[in-house]
Amino acid sequence: MTASVILGALSFGTRVDEAASFDLLDQFTDLGGRWIDTANNYSFWIDPSGLGGQSETVIGHWLDQRPGARDRVLISTKSGYEPVSPGGPPEGLSAKAIRAAAELSLQRLSTGRVDLYWAHVEDRSVPLDESVGALGELVSSGAAAALGASNWPAWRVERARAAAAGQGVTGFTAIQQRYSYLQPRPDVALPESGHRLVFPETLDYLASTPDLRLWAYNTLLNGSYVRSDRPLAEAYNHPGVPRRLAALDTVAAEEGASRNQIVLAWLLAHDIAPIVGVTTPEQVGEAMAAQRLQLTADQLTRLTAAG
């Protein structure tokens, strides 16, 4: 599978109403986009109910109202971090929780199967074999085509893959973690405590595991590459950042592109699938145009070597 821009649907049904979400989905697919990424807990922290499901519901309504759309798109969703009640603890990854969450996600999405099902977070309170077995059942039952681990450390992913092999069930073939062109300082905690960053160890693990792919989220750093009103977090306050931004600006000028587009093109050139959360048509257009950029070997070398 060649890496492509993935539409992040976190804001659908909350910050972006249903009609506007439909427009963004139409635009994305009209421009050739295929993958749509959501989760069963999007977005409980925004919705007055204190529970998620709004994003999946909007996508399901869109599929219902667009005959043939399901055959043109690929859908990924996640479970593990939806609150069990407003303000309550997350559902976790017990076999019971996974089965219940998957069934509800399929109902909301108005589909019989998702193309990739993610364990959204770790749950070390549950035996790994139990979670792995329940996830594997989703594939054997036809509810999911493939499985991924979101916000898991590399060693736990590998242990889970070994457990799946031991049980004779499908294991993880994708990792989803936070990654972008600018790299934060590892000694400064990010405000989003549940996020797990890609580190050199992660990339080394992926390079030695060819059947495991990386999906990157927060690729555009909440707009910080291009918006002065959204400064970079403290974790990005180090000497390497100005050097990388200078290289980014040079290549952007050479290509007549935006910083965001060069970041996405750089990720794609490294076979990393960037998830781009969108709320406006302009953001969809910018992201899909980035997919058409072909950076030269020299440009990629300069970008990677900077900082």
Short names for language-model regions:
Residues 1-15, 74-89, 113-118, 223, ...:
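N-terminal small/glycine-rich loop or linker at the start of catalytic domains
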Residues 1-72, 219:
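N-terminal binding-site loop/beta-alpha segment at the start of enzyme catalytic domains
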Residues 3-8, 36-38, 73-77, 114-119, ...:
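Hydrophobic faces of well-ordered beta-strands that scaffold small-molecule active sites
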Residues 13-19, 42-55, 83-85, 122-127, ...:
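Acidic-and-aromatic substrate-binding clefts and catalytic sites of carbohydrate-active enzymes
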Residues 16-28, 94-109, 158-162:
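Short, acidic/polar
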Residues 29-30, 62-74, 106-110, 136-139, ...:
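Acidic (Asp/Glu)-rich catalytic clusters
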Residues 106-127:
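Active-site groove signature of glycoside hydrolases
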Residues 126-307:
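Beta/alpha (TIM)-barrel catalytic core signal, keyed to glycine-rich beta->alpha loops juxtaposed to Asp/Glu
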